[in-house]
């Protein structure tokens, strides 16, 4: 199976976690896009969706899935999204698609976080994938210096502006042994909006696609 076929398999496998008559939290990226395709097959049986990015919102609307603003919703039953890396403790690096802040907010609201990923994203130690940090533009140089002090090598993601109007620094050369502590350290740097470490609020269930099928963790 190709990587895209593995992503499609886990996207459709996540459909069994969707309860009819609920509003579903939807993530961003190529794997989440397959879940949106699957969600369209039950669009008349759910109330709608809350999206973590403008791109996912556009896809949801194009498929006729009602879209809600998060401020209109008291709670979400589930949030389904991909990951750039996930470890055995269900901690993740996310933000390759630059939607990390909205993803983290929706994950916090949802009762259950379903991570969908192909097997290449499952790692023992987080950090091979550069860690995205969303930063207020005026603080870019300051935050970069602070990230160097933490042992990282930050690189400005040229030409990318988040849906919130901010920039992304991708931090290389990190072997993340204590993800919870590092998440807190980086989030405490003035000028950081949020870091793409999902450790304090990790996934509850991971659906991992491989040649052998979809493996359920959690």
UniProtKB/Swiss-Prot annotation:
UniProt record, GO biological process? D-ribose metabolic process; pentose-phosphate shunt, non-oxidative branch
- Sorted UniProt keywords: Isomerase
Specify one Pfam family: Rib_5-P_isom_A
Pathway listed: Carbohydrate degradation; pentose phosphate pathway; D-ribose 5-phosphate from D-ribulose 5-phosphate (non-oxidative stage): step 1/1
Name of the protein in its database record = Ribose-5-phosphate isomerase A
Can you list the GO cellular component terms from the UniProt entry?
cytosol
- How is the subunit organization of this protein annotated in UniProt? Homodimer.
Q: Where does substrate bind?
A: 28-31, 81-84, 94-97, 121
Q: Which family does it belong to?
A: Belongs to the ribose 5-phosphate isomerase family.
* Reaction catalysed by this enzyme: aldehydo-D-ribose 5-phosphate = D-ribulose 5-phosphate
Q: Tell me which EC number(s) this protein carries.
A: 5.3.1.6
What cystine linkages occur within this chain?
Answer: none
Return the NCBIfam families for the record. PRK00702.1, rpiA
Instruction: Tell me the function of this protein.
Output: Catalyzes the reversible conversion of ribose-5-phosphate to ribulose 5-phosphate.
Q: Which SUPFAM superfamilies match?
A: D-ribose-5-phosphate isomerase (RpiA), lid domain, NagB/RpiA/CoA transferase-like
Which residues are the active-site ones? 103
Q: Which molecular-function annotations from GO does this UniProt entry contain?
A: ribose-5-phosphate isomerase activity
The record's listing under InterPro entries reads:
NagB/RpiA_transferase-like, Ribose5P_isomerase_typA_subgr, Ribose5P_isomerase_type_A
